[in-house]
Regions:
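Hydrophobic secretory-pathway targeting helix
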Residues: 1-40, 183-204
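Short, aromatic- and cysteine-enriched interfacial helices/patches
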Residues: 1-5, 124, 171
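Alpha-helical transmembrane signal-anchor/signal-peptide segments
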Residues: 27-51, 171-175
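Membrane-proximal low-complexity regions enriched in glycine and acidic/polar residues
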Residues: 44-137
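Short, low-complexity, polar/charged sequence segments that are solvent-exposed and flexible
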Residues: 77-81, 155-160, 191-195
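Extended, charge-rich, solvent-exposed interface segments
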Residues: 109-123, 169-203
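Extended, hydrophilic extramembrane loops/domains of integral membrane proteins
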Residues: 125-176
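Cytoplasmic C-terminal tails of single-pass
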Residues: 209-219
Length: 219
């Protein structure tokens, strides 16, 4: 048993483990990123069907009010201070063919998203087409139950949908903005770590096995 563990490279195991972790967290989004992207405009008018696992990219033409907000704050344990709550993400409503979907927008795009919401309502009241340019690159996922419940409340309270109409929409979907280029890099780095870890493991195993074999031959 000791011989077996001596043949295993700790560095190789660590490298392989890091690589596997990076692959686990990045490969699903990497696969989505390589799918042909559907446009927000086609999704809006129902020209394409949107399902979980789809890749949606481009400019968002219209956007309704947010139905949920994600806030974060930072705690500094060294001086027991806490920063004020800060909005890091908002979840908006967007028409999508015969249904409605959620659109997740991060803090860097919130100002543009709010402008687009105001301009959308202005357009529906007889004003000009929206000019705010909200560009997103998204994966489509099913909402988690907490967001789904808030989304249902929003559709019932502000858009006059019945429970049956919401049920008929099928799974409630969320379009989540993703940094697909960065995610692909993580996948590549993860694969590199796995390969490097395997090389180190094989070399260590081969080297130590030869030493043990030589010792056995000398006995």
């Amino acid at each position: 048993m000791n011989n077996f563990f001596n043949k295993i490279s700790r560095a190789g195991l660590i490298l392989a483990a890091i690589g596997i972790f990076l692959l686990v967290v990045s490969v699903p989004d990497t696969l989505v990123s390589f799918k042909a992207a559907k446009s927000f405009e086609d999704a809006l008018y129902g020209d394409v069907e949107i399902n979980a696992g789809d890749h949606v990219q481009g400019q968002v033409p219209y956007l309704f009010d947010h139905f949920a907000v994600e806030q974060t704050r930072t705690e500094n344990k060294s001086n027991n201070s806490v920063t004020p709550w800060k909005t890091s993400r908002r979840y908006y409503v967007m028409p999508c063919g015969e249904r409605f979907v959620g659109v997740s927008v991060g803090s860097s795009s919130l100002s543009v998203a709010e402008d687009l919401v105001d301009q959308t309502w202005g357009f529906l009241s007889g004003g000009a087409d929206p000019t705010a340019e909200l560009e997103l690159d998204c994966r489509v996922v099913e909402m988690d139950e907490e967001l789904a419940e808030m989304f249902r409340d929003e559709l019932r309270d502000y858009y006059d949908f019945t429970d049956q109409e919401i049920e008929d929409m099928g799974p409630l979907l969320m379009m989540e903005g993703r940094a697909f280029t960065t995610i692909r890099v993580f996948s590549g780095v993860g694969l590199g770590f796995v390969v490097l870890g395997l090389i180190v493991l094989v070399r260590r195993w081969t080297k130590v096995s030869k030493v043990y074999q030589q010792n056995q031959d000398m006995m």
